[in-house]
A protein has these predicted regions:
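N-terminal maturation segment of proteins
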Residues: 1-258
Length: 258
């Protein structure tokens, strides 16, 4: 293993620590349990800090001499670049955190459900971590209110309202079902925390109904961003027009073959 490859491996490990600390929910989904008791910091200040840190990692990755890497390391380097660049694109150009209320609601559902699956941890351990996340949910939703701006698309507000209904049903059924295997104290803790989340969702729903009239953005990402994803994320040598033409040609072939 060359020094350059060792440096790359250490840099990627450092970057992953940043990613998981910034997104504990994703970490839990991947089986990394160091952050299970948190939801993460979704404040505007935290996003600004994330952008700055990712820009530093991008510069450090670009400074790696890929000629000194073997094939596997070059692939790791390419994947790391794709992840950093795409993350920066979402945070800066698309500003998803300022205009996707549905995503925030969906994140909560994932944050809770990921701690109730069978992954080798004891139910009591999972319950303690679930309880911690449930108690953090009301402040999380308050932060979301502060983040959302008029660039939000009305459709995305409507999607969030629909997502709230689904999350309510999940809280009312899945969590009591999971808690049934626990001792009574933990059952009561989860029930009390769940009630707090339900109340916070009621308040967030009222906020979204009022916010809807102020949401004037478009749900479309635009051709430039779409082309960026095709080229730099999906690694396709096609722009949106060429992809459309390819799809139409395939449909015509399929129809002719029927």
């Amino acid at each position: 293993v060359t020094t350059t490859q060792s440096e790359l491996a250490a840099l990627i490990d450092e970057y992953l620590q940043l990613v998981f600390a910034a997104d504990p929910i994703e970490a839990t989904q991947l089986g990394i349990h160091d952050y299970d008791s948190t939801l993460g910091d979704y404040s505007a200040e935290a996003y600004t800090e994330q952008i700055a840190k990712r820009q530093v990692f991008l510069s450090r990755l670009q400074a790696i001499d890929t000629d000194k890497l073997d094939a596997d390391a070059r692939m790791d380097h390419q994947l790391a670049l794709i992840d950093v660049r795409t993350a920066l694109r979402r945070l800066q150009d698309r500003a998803i955190w300022m205009c996707a209320p549905y995503w925030y609601v969906e994140q909560l559902g994932v944050a809770f459900s990921a701690l109730m699956r069978d992954d080798g941890q004891s139910p009591a351990t999972q319950a303690e971590r679930l309880w911690a996340r449930l108690r953090l949910a009301p402040s999380y939703l308050e932060t979301v209110k502060s983040n959302l701006t008029s660039i939000t698309a009305p459709l995305h507000v409507e999607m969030a309202l629909t997502a709230i209904k689904g999350l309510r049903n999940f809280l009312a059924s899945a969590i009591p079902g999971f808690a049934a295997q626990l001792e009574e104290t933990l059952q009561n803790d989860l029930a009390h925390a769940t009630a707090g989340v339900q109340q916070a969702l009621d308040e967030f729903e009222r906020f979204l109904h009022e916010f809807h009239d102020h949401a004037t953005g478009s749900f479309a990402c635009g051709p430039e961003h779409f082309d960026y994803l095709l080229k730099h994320y999906h690694l396709l040598d096609l722009d949106h027009r060429q992809l459309r033409d390819f799809g139409l040609a395939q449909m015509a072939e399929d129809k002719a073959a029927q």
